[in-house]
Every structure is written in C-alpha cells, then in structure tokens.
Amino acid sequence: MMDNQAVKSLLEMGIPHEVAVDALQRTGGNLEAAVNFIFSNELPEQAEMGEENDGSQPRISENKIVAGTKPCDVPNNGDQDIDMPDVSGVDVDYDDDEDITDERSGSNSTSGCRVTAQNYDRYSISETSIPPPSYSIVQHNEFKSNVGDPTVVLPLPLNSLIESYFGLFALLTAVYFPHVFLKPDFKDLNYRADWFKGSSFTEPKYRLAYCEAEDGSTTSEIVLASGPNEGLQPHLLWQLQKLISVVNTRKCERAFVSAKVFTSSLEPQLRSKLADSEHLYEVLPAFIKSLAVDLEMCPGIRDRETRSLFISSALHTPNKNEPPMETFLSLFHFLPEEYDSNLYKMFNVLLYPEEEEEEEDVIRGGEQEEARYVEPENTLKEVAPVLTILFNELETNTESVSLPNGVDIPLEFYPQLYTKQCKDQLIRHIISKRKQARTRSRCLLQEINELKSYQGKNISTILESTLAYLQTIPDDANNEAAKQIASLKDTLNSARAAKMEEYKDLASKLHGEWNLSHPETHIINTAKQLGLIENPYILTMAALSPYSYFIRSRNGAWSWIQSNTLGTEFKVKKCSSPSVVQEAIKHGTKYASETPLMFIYCEEGKIPTEEVVAEALKSNSGCLKFAEDDQNSLKTLRSQFFDGMGDPEQATNNINNGNDNDNDDDIDSDN
C-alpha cells in the first residue's frame, strides 16, 4: 500500500495531489525516488526494468462494459463476427505535403489499416458489449425520424477501412466549411435518386473548360457540357458539394450517405497512392490535397487558397548547423508508444525538444548558457484553421501500451503555443525558468537534507537529546551550553523552513505558471495577454474508428454514431454534455487501438455562422437544386410507403419504428 505520510510529505512541498500519487506509484512508494522523478523525470533502475518486463498488460482494447456503468457509456468500436465479400482498395503520390512526423515513426510493419474480417474475429464483441444497432438499410430507412439529427456517413467494410476515414473527413468539411466549397456553382449537379449509395458516379451537366490566356497562363470557366470531358475535372468537389447540399439544408430528412460516394470519384494518382499505402497517415494528406486542388481548379479561386485551410507550415531543422527549412503538413500522427496522459504532453515531445534536452542536462548536473539555444528541431510557422491529429493503430511490433486513465483530449486546444513566434517570445523563457527551478530545487533538497541529518543521524534528534541531558544537570556551564544548543536548533529550523518555503514556491511555479504539460493553468492566459494567441481550436470530430465516431454540430451539440462493420446498420445518440466525448476518448486510448483514431480541431474564429452557410447555399443554384431534388426524392419514397400501407399515418409510424436509433435516450455524462 502507498504510504499516506509520503503523500503528505509531497503535498507539504507544494506538489499537486495527483502528481504526488502518480510519482509514488511509479517509484514503488519510495519518497526520495518520487521527488527525484517529479523534478528530473528520472525513474530508479528497478522501476524502469519492471515497466519494460511487464508483459501482462493487454494490448487490445475490447471496450468491455465496466460493472456498474450504463450500456451507452462505453463506445462500441464496431467489431463483429461477420463474413463479407473481399473488396479491394485502390490509388498515389504527393510529396509536397509530407508529414514532418514521418521521421519519428520508423515503422516498417506490414500490418496496416487494411485489416481483414478474419483478423477482427479474434476481437469480436463479447456478450456484455453494446448490442448491435437495429437501424437497417434493407428496410429502406433513408429517413430521419428527427430532422435535427446529423446526416451519417456510413463506413465501408473492413478491407476498405482507410476509405471510410475519407468519408468522415469530407463530412467534417461539409459541416464546418461549406461556404468555402460552395463558391463554384455548377448550375446542375445532375441528381440521381441513388446518389447517396456511391454505387455509380454522375457528372454535372456543367463542367470546367480551360483556355490559355495571352500571358501563357491557363484559366477555367464553368460551361454547359457538350460532349466527353476534356481536361481535368473536379470529381471529388462535385461529390462534396452533393453532401454539403444535404447536410446544410434545414429540415433535411436524408439519414445517411455512404463513404463510397467519395471513393468512386478518386482521381488516378490518389487511387495509386491508396493502393500502395498501409497506414491512414500515409494517404490522408493526399486526399486532403485532392479536395483543395479540385476547388482551386475552379474560376475565381486563387492558387493554394484552399490548401491553406487544411495545410499548416512548419520549420524543420535536420541539423543544428543548418538554417531551418519550411515544410508543409496536413496532419500530426502519433505512434501508440507516444500516447501520454494529455495531448499537450504529446505535442511537447514533438515540438519542445529543448525541454527534453534541459531535463537531461539537469540530470547530468551540467550547465548550459542561454546563448546555446538554437532553432528547435521542429516548430510550427502557421497553423491552418483545420488541425487533424491521428493516433496510429496497433501493429504486430507495437510495444505494450497501457495508460490507466487514457489520453485527455481537450475540447479547446491551443496549437499556437508551438509556433515560432510564441516559442521565441514566451516558451523559451519558461523553459529557461524551468531549468533554473529544477537545478535550484535539487540543490535545495540536498541542502535541506544536510540540515536534517549528518552521517545518517537526525541532527534535530541529537540536539534534543543533548538538551534533555544538559537539563538534568542544572549548573551555569550546562545552562549556557543549553542556550547555545537551543539557539543552534532554532537557527537550523529557521534555515530549513526558509529553504522549504523556497522549494515549495518553485514547485508551485513548476506545476502552475511554468507548467508546459497543463498550459491551461497559466501559460495560455499569459500568451493571450501578450497577444501571441487569440482563438482556441475547437474539437469538432473524434473518430475512435469509422464505426464509432463523435461529431459536433456548429451550435456545439455532440452526437455519437455507431455502425456495424458492414456499414448496413447504425445508431445515432445525442450526448448530454461534451464530457461524454472526453470520457469515451479516454476509454478508447487506455490501450493501443486496432484502428486509427482521428481527431479534428477547427479554429473557433473561422467556423461560419448559420446565416453565412444559408447565404452561401442560397447563392449556389446547383447545390440548391440538388437539395430540393433530394428532398423531393425522399417525399416520393415516403408516398410509395403510403400507397403500399394504405394508411399514411401507419406508414409513417412504420418508417419511424425502423429508425429506432433516433429515439434513444441521450447519453448521460454521469458514468
């Protein structure tokens, strides 16, 4: 058991309770080792070996329901024992947008996102898991029973896992940046009643035509097509505009759209890239770039205008003796071994390498001059309004990963803390202060220990024993000696108390105003006061897998969508509070996941209002017509139900009974 006195001792030093408990757990209750770990991040050899040799930790999270929780408290990752046809994926190379974190992954495993159904059978849902949803496409439940529910993007089977994430990214774009992609108006998107299935691709009646200007540049215009396509056409944009039309129409009744809508329109290079990729992080940047390039083909859109929406810039220094090079990235990705207790800690390791170097220097007892600071290995230059973060999936060579509390993904994130401007004007100063505080704290601990004991004996105990002895023989000499010893004791106590107060003050600052792992406690406010950061980035999507994802509406309401691995059944549940999403993420990140996890943040100031979206949709005649055609198609389908059932009221009830996913109770935040 943990020694309560040890916890109390750390609390008296100004260490937060959770930090104290964690440090004692890591060091087996050893107080001295715990203090050393807190300020130097150095574990005793035995503790480190114990962690390395612990092979008993599970590597797969089966998302079993914990006793006492409600069935809806734990997300279902969609794993089920099913047979399915073998659907092959297809598609190519974009070197522009290489992720600067690629160099860190170093993974050459042959197992990737293209997982077969047989592999998933080993991790089938247990009897205590959430029952499979009962929303059946076979029953033609294309209608929402509540028009306020989000339109769902249904995933593809497991052997097309990566493509399912394409659909989720497109959905996020359709919800949060429709006004950007509604700028080109193709007049008539050529509606077909089965468009939402993605089984076929239909081109609009108006397409792009290219002409060469006098200066040699090429311009485009939207014209009525008179024959076969000549030149590049924005196939992916057309499909995205169809989705935008539906999800942003008020009182839309379209319940779902298949992710196949987007895979059917991938251009050849992207198909080739997809065929050669084993991991989502390898091919998602190409999909994002393809979306942007499609829009930039259109008239009135400046080159690279759209790419800046998704693609951030960074400064990368491969060698400290070389100047930094600008590079571009559309996502960050982390290996399971790089999971940490919160997202800021994970970014710190990636983008604050000097912090790690300073810790090592303190451990060695060395000193570094301020002038030795050089450009960090990686730093952000500009952060795009859309920030995509991937947690890589479990692989055969993945080390055992176990985080008892999972990863804390904040609802509001400030990636601006990792820009060069913020690091130069604030973070370097904090890192320097942290280094000095750690060095001083270690000295104080040593000095306090020297004032407390000598050759393993407690000095206060010796002085008290001596005083007690002298007081048994009351003569002038002994009385004088007793006064001197009492004075010495008071001096020692005062010196110890002063050093302890200084130590507590440093500890408070390290875990408060200089805490890089929890910048929300102080650093973010300081950065705002200095004008270095403004808007937070809002968590808008959390995909634990394509079969279990959370999405936030523009007004802040969260929904949880679950589906089976065939993409034929799904459930929609309303979340009673955002904390439900955070708890689900923590549960899903306690161990390495079988599928990639995707988190998407959007800059608060760039999220459009309902009025802006409505105006953009109203101004695009092609999308407006498509939305009307889709709603008319659903009305026709509903009338066919009426004709078949005889009683219109009964027919409506039958449709709504099939949509029982829309009538589930809200997910309670009280677990």
Curated annotation (Swiss-Prot):
Gene3D superfamilies: DNA helicase RuvA subunit, C-terminal domain. The keyword Heme does not apply. CDD domains: UBA_RUP1p. Residues 661-671 have a biased composition (Acidic residues). Keywords: Coiled coil, Cytoplasm, Nucleus, Phosphoprotein, Ubl conjugation pathway. It is found in: Cytoplasm; Nucleus. GO terms for cellular component: cytoplasm; nucleus. Residues 432-501 form a coiled coil. SMART domains: UBA (SM00165). Residues 1-41 form the UBA domain. The keyword Cytoplasm applies. One of its GO terms (biological process) is protein deubiquitination. The modification Phosphoserine is found at residue 56. Residues 68-87, 643-671 are annotated as: Disordered. Modulates the activity of the RSP5 HECT ubiquitin-protein ligase through its mediation of the interaction between RSP5 and the deubiquitinase UBP2. Involved in regulation of cell wall homeostasis. PANTHER family: UBA DOMAIN-CONTAINING PROTEIN RUP1. Forms a ternary complex with RSP5 and UBP2. Present with 5930 molecules/cell in log phase SD medium. This is UBA domain-containing protein RUP1.
